[in-house]
Amino acid sequence: NNVDKLNGDW
């Protein structure tokens, strides 16, 4: 899932 990379900035 790309969600991990998107949430990585948080």
Swiss-Prot record:
Give one GO molecular function term.
pheromone binding
Keyword Transcription regulation tagged: no
Subcellular localization(s) per the UniProt record: Secreted
Q: Which UniProt keywords apply?
A: Pheromone-binding, Secreted, Transport
- UniProt superkingdom: Eukaryota
Q: Does the keyword Transport apply?
A: yes
Q: Which GO terms describe its cellular component?
A: extracellular region
Q: Which family does it belong to?
A: Belongs to the calycin superfamily. Lipocalin family.
What the protein does comes down to:
Binds pheromones that are released from drying urine of males. These pheromones affect the sexual behavior of females.
Q: In its UniProt entry, what is this protein called?
A: Major urinary protein 2
